[in-house]
Amino acid sequence: MADFNQILTTGDVDGGIINVVNEIPAGSNHKIEWNRKLAAFQLDRVEPAIFAKPTNYGFIPQTLDEDGDELDVLLVTEQPLATGVFLEARVIGVMKFVDDGEVDDKIVCVPADDRNNGNAYKTLADLPQQLIKQIEFHFNHYKDLKKAGTTKVESWGDAEEAKKVIKESIERWNKQA
């Protein structure tokens, strides 16, 4: 398998277009993670079916969030994307998130070229409010059966705030490289 951190860049962050590697298809309860040391995808665990991911879930190559992993992405598409698919995506916002006391923000994005929706999603406000509620509920509760109260969606930010989070994660990546 190719090492996505070697073959892909982060993309054009200032232009709002980033490279994304998908780990978990929307609707899956399999917690699949990119293992950076092995340059391979690994099944970390199987979550309860009620906590299937409401969106595709992936990462931005050559970034590190404060939790030590690549910066996470919530990728909104109409159909699930397979594990290992990579694409250019347009940044529309950020979900500010804390997991067990650690910052674990999620960049919200859509495919950069979505001809089915006419590229209708340009901001978080363009997304269906029910989807935002589902995402927030999922991340506030997906660990409740194991350790209740350890996750919290703190706030939502716009694309400019998301770009700032991405740039900070690029700096962390560059420091460890």
Curated annotation (Swiss-Prot):
Keywords: Cytoplasm, Hydrolase, Magnesium, Metal-binding. It is found in: Cytoplasm. Gene3D superfamilies: Inorganic pyrophosphatase. Its EC number is 3.6.1.1. CDD domains: pyrophosphatase (cd00412). Mg(2+) 1 binds at residues 67, 72, 104. Mg(2+) 2 binds at residue 72. It comes from the Bacteria. Transmembrane segments: none annotated. It is an enzyme of class 3 (hydrolase). One of its GO terms (biological process) is phosphate-containing compound metabolic process. It catalyses: diphosphate + H2O = 2 phosphate + H(+). GO terms for cellular component: cytoplasm. One of its GO terms (molecular function) is inorganic diphosphate phosphatase activity. Its cofactor is Mg(2+). The keyword Magnesium applies. Substrate binds at residues 31, 45, 57, 142. InterPro entries: Pyrophosphatase, Pyrophosphatase_sf. Catalyzes the hydrolysis of inorganic pyrophosphate (PPi) forming two phosphate ions. Homohexamer. Belongs to the PPase family. This is Inorganic pyrophosphatase. It comes from Neisseria meningitidis serogroup A / serotype 4A (strain DSM 15465 / Z2491). The lineage of its organism: Bacteria, Pseudomonadati, Pseudomonadota, Betaproteobacteria, Neisseriales. The gene is ppa.
